[in-house]
Each structure stands twice: as structure tokens, then as C-alpha cells.
Design a protein with these regions (language model features):
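Beta1-alpha1 glycine-rich phosphate/pyrophosphate-binding loop at the start
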Residues: 2-77, 84, 166, 173-217, ...
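C-terminal, flexible cofactor-proximal segment of oxidoreductases
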Residues: 8, 333-438
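Short glycine-rich anion-binding loops that position phosphate/pyrophosphate groups of nucleotides
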Residues: 19, 111-114, 179, 268-270
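FAD-site-proximal beta/loop scaffold in flavoenzymes
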Residues: 124-156, 248-251, 256-327, 334
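Rossmann-like dinucleotide-binding core of oxidoreductases
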Residues: 159-217, 224, 235-237, 319-348, ...
Length: 438
């Protein structure tokens, strides 16, 4: 920012995720005009999206309107728009609507997208889960598959088996959590709510080219996670490289695995921020930033969260997780506040690693806090508490906590609604002796 200017500084934040909202919150009392831009009108708690996809939670449980979150931030306005480009020399952000926004400081917190490692054509048949729409579509596909299996029980047993086969690709926390949740949903629903399905008919597979799960965790915890998945009936297939994906199958070498639902959780890449800025990026497309989170040569532009690459302790990159994005947002807000006040800003972001958590299902999780390692119920309790804490508002914490308690007591997943699919995706009704016409 130009320290000679006397007018009110214009701060533009692109992205209302954990990082972007942390910046807005940190600047809520600053003598500046803050503009927060996002393509969606809601802030989404992405770590729990898989629970929407597996009917444990409803979309509104993990999302909140951005305008409601920043309602009390008197210096902040919200724009529902998409960024087209950034003119670094003119200090302008060009929006899809045609609006040009001037800035004195720009914060880019646009997150990450799924990476298919050059096979973007797989995205149609193996969707990842990054948005509410993604989660609803996956949920509906899972539930439709079970309905079809119930309807087709007198037809080809091979086809029926395919309706009850679900494949998750990816060995990180998202893949592990998704596979465990699908297993719990489908097996409990098959046993309780479908007259002609058995839990033993359900097949859930977790496929990954690596030779172990959860690379960020110690090996002993990874093995415990694998054992927990297998206890739920998940087939864990490690060292299996996916060579092709179609609408109803996954190819592993020459082996063809038929499936009704395929979910991608194998990799991410950054948003196009590096292209907007013409900045240096790492292999994942993340903008390489200085220790103070600014872009080299542009002290007025900051990149945070999954969009950035910055060294942490020991020279290792700071992980792309919600706590890191939130801490970076808080740090950048301090830098901007200090600059506005013409004080010396902090020079280096220091990430406080509070550990790694992954849940496998009901009462099953792993937690790595360095010297302290947890698994089983204790890790699951810590995981649940931590995720409730990071939800955006008190209402969401109460709603999610209550739903989890109800599900824990009853095994019931109340959000089993089939929505968002065309009529062509719905099962064809077949009348049988024990299913009378109405």
C-alpha cells in the first residue's frame, strides 16, 4: 500500500473460505474499505462435505450466508461475482460482471480444485466433493444405486452387484473418511430400511497407487486406520494405479472393477491465481510467496490458504488445511492493519501445527499430535470437538452436534434425500407381490 495516500485504503479479498473470512474479521475495525468477493453466497465448511454426501448432515448444517457472517463488520461489503483477471500495475481486479475494483491491498484466498493429473475427462464419471452441489449429487447417486439394487433383485445378479459397489479413489483423510462413511451408510441402510438387501451384498473399495494410507500420519496410525476401514468392510487396495475411469467402472491395470458410484479424492490443484498474477507457482499451481505471504515484487498482494506455497518449520511447505488458512488470514490482517497505521508489520508467518486428525467412522479415528498419538474413541471425540469448534457460527455447532448425537444413539442418517438428479437417473419401478400398487 502507498503510505503517502491520505484516502481510505481499499482492501479487496477474493474468496470467503477460512482464510478470506479470517482476513475480513481481522480488518473489521480497521480504517479501510473492505470488499469480499466470492462466487457463492455462502461460506462452506468443506471438511464436513463428505457427511453431506453420505446423508449424515444437510447442506445448511455446514454452510452459512456470507452476508450474515460479516453483518456486523461495518467497513465490509460483499460481492457475488467471479474474478477474470488482476492488473498488478494499475492495481485493478476485473470481475466477470464487468466491474473493475481498485485496491491498495489485495488478498487472494481462492482455495483449490480437484486434480486429475492430466485426465480431466475423468471428472464427469468420478466427481470430487468441493461444493454443496457435488455432495448432493454424490449422495443422490449412492441412494439411487441402492434403490436400483432393491428394484432389480430378480434380474441379472451381476448388474445387481454393480449397483451395490462403491469405489473411492484417494488415500488421504478425505478418501479415508469418505470410504468409511459410505460403508456405514450403505450397510446400515441395507440392513434396516431395504426389504431385499443385505449388508453383506454391499461392496466398498478404497483404491490408491501409494503403498500406505494417510501419508501425513505416522505409519502405526495409518495401519490402525486401515484396520478400522477393514472392520467396516471396506476393501483397501493399495499399490493399485488407476489407468482409466468410465461411467460404471475403474480400470486398475488390466482389471476392470464395475461400480455404481465412483468418488475422486486423490489430489488437488490450486485456483488460477498464479495465472492472474503472472507469478511463480509450484507443481500444484500454488503461488510461491514470501515469508510474509506477499507475492515477490508485489508487497501489496497477498496469497493465502491452498492457493499459496510458503515454507514452514524445517523448510517443509505449510499444509493446505483449514487451520493453516485461518492462521494465514489472521497474519495478513495484522500486516495490513500495521501498514494502515504506518507501523512496522510482522515479517514472517509462523504456522502453529495443532496436529492431524482423520475419522474413519462411528467411534473410529486417528489423531497425531507429535508426541501424543490417539486412535479409536478418544481420537474420534477429539476430531468431533475440533470440527465443531471450526464451524462458522453457534447455530451450526448446535445443529451439527445434535445431529451427531442423534446418529450416534440411533445409527440413523436423516438426510437421505434423492435430489438434484434428472428423471433418467431414477430407478424404474417394478411391482412385486409384496409391493402392492397404490
Amino acid at each position: 500500500m502507498d503510505k503517502k495516500t491520505r484516502r481510505t485504503p481499499e482492501i479487496v479479498i477474493i474468496g470467503a473460505g477460512f482464510g478470506g473470512l479470517a482476513v475480513a474479521r481481522g480488518l473489521r475495525r480497521a480504517k479501510a474499505n473492505v470488499t469480499l468477493i466470492d462466487r457463492q453466497n455462502h461460506h462452506l465448511f468443506q471438511p464436513l462435505l463428505y457427511q453431506v454426501a453420505t446423508a449424515a448432515l444437510s447442506p445448511a448444517d455446514i454452510a452459512a450466508p456470507i452476508r450474515a457472517i460479516v453483518r456486523r463488520y461495518r467497513n465490509t461489503r460483499v460481492l457475488l461475482d467471479s474474478v477474470v483477471s488482476v492488473d498488478r500495475e494499475a492495481r485493478l481486479v476485473q470481475l466477470e460482471s464487468g466491474t473493475s475494483l481498485p485496491y491498495d491491498a489485495l488478498v487472494i484466498a481462492t482455495g483449490a480444485r480437484h486434480s486429475y493429473f492430466g485426465r480431466e475427462d475423468w471428472a464427469v464419471d468420478a466427481p470430487g466433493i468441493k461444493t454443496i452441489d457435488d455432495a448432493i449429487k454424490v449422495r443422490s447417486k449412492i441412494l439411487v444405486a441402492m434403490e436400483r439394487a432393491e428394484t432389480d433383485r430378480q434380474e441379472n445378479p451381476v448388474t445387481r452387484s454393480q449397483h451395490l459397489t462403491f469405489i473411492v479413489i484417494g488415500d488421504g483423510p478425505t478418501g479415508v473418511e469418505m470410504a468409511g462413511a459410505i460403508a456405514e451408510l450403505t450397510r446400515h441402510a441395507a440392513g434396516l430400511d431395504f426389504r431385499h438387501l443385505s449388508p453383506s451384498c454391499v461392496r466398498v473399495m478404497l483404491v490408491q497407487s501409494d503403498t500406505r494410507l494417510l501419508a501425513a500420519f505416522p505409519l502405526d496410525l495409518a495401519e490402525k486406520a486401515k484396520a478400522s476401514l477393514e472392520h467396516l468392510g471396506v476393501e483397501v487396495r493399495l499399490g493399485n494405479r488407476v489407468t482409466n475411469i468410465t461411467a460404471d467402472s475403474v480400470m486398475i491395470g488390466d482389471e476392470r472393477l464395475s461400480a455404481a458410484v465412483i468418488v475422486w479424492a486423490a489430489g488437488v490443484k490450486a485456483s488460477p491465481a498464479a495465472a492472474w498474477l503472472g507469478a511463480e507457482a509450484d507443481r500444484a499451481g500454488r503461488v510461491i510467496v514470501k515469508p510474509n505471504m506477499s507475492v515477490p515484487g508485489h508487497p501489496d498482494i497477498f496469497v493465502i490458504g491452498d492457493t499459496s506455497s510458503v515454507e514452514g518449520a524445517g523448510g517443509r511447505p505449510v499444509p493446505g488445511v483449514a487451520p493453516a488458512a485461518k492462521q494465514q488470514g489472521q497474519f495478513v490482517a495484522r500486516v495490513i492493519r500495521a501498514t494502515i497505521r504506518r507501523r512496522r508489520p510482522p515479517r514472517r508467518f509462523k504456522y502453529k501445527d495443532y496436529g492431524n486428525l482423520a475419522t474413519i467412522g462411528r467411534k473410529r479415528a486417528v489423531a497425531d499430535f507429535g508426541r501424543t498419538k490417539l486412535s479409536g474413541f478418544s481420537a474420534w471425540f477429539v476430531w468431533s470437538t475440533a470440527h465443531l469448534f471450526y464451524l462458522s457460527d453457534f447455530r451450526s455447532r448446535i445443529t451439527v452436534g445434535t445431529q451427531w448425537l442423534w446418529s450416534y444413539i440411533t445409527f440413523d442418517r436423516g438426510a437421505r434425500l434423492i435430489t438434484g438428479l434428472g428423471d433418467g437417473m431414477m430407478p424404474t419401478t417394478v411391482w412385486t407381490d409384496d409391493a402392492p400398487k397404490e
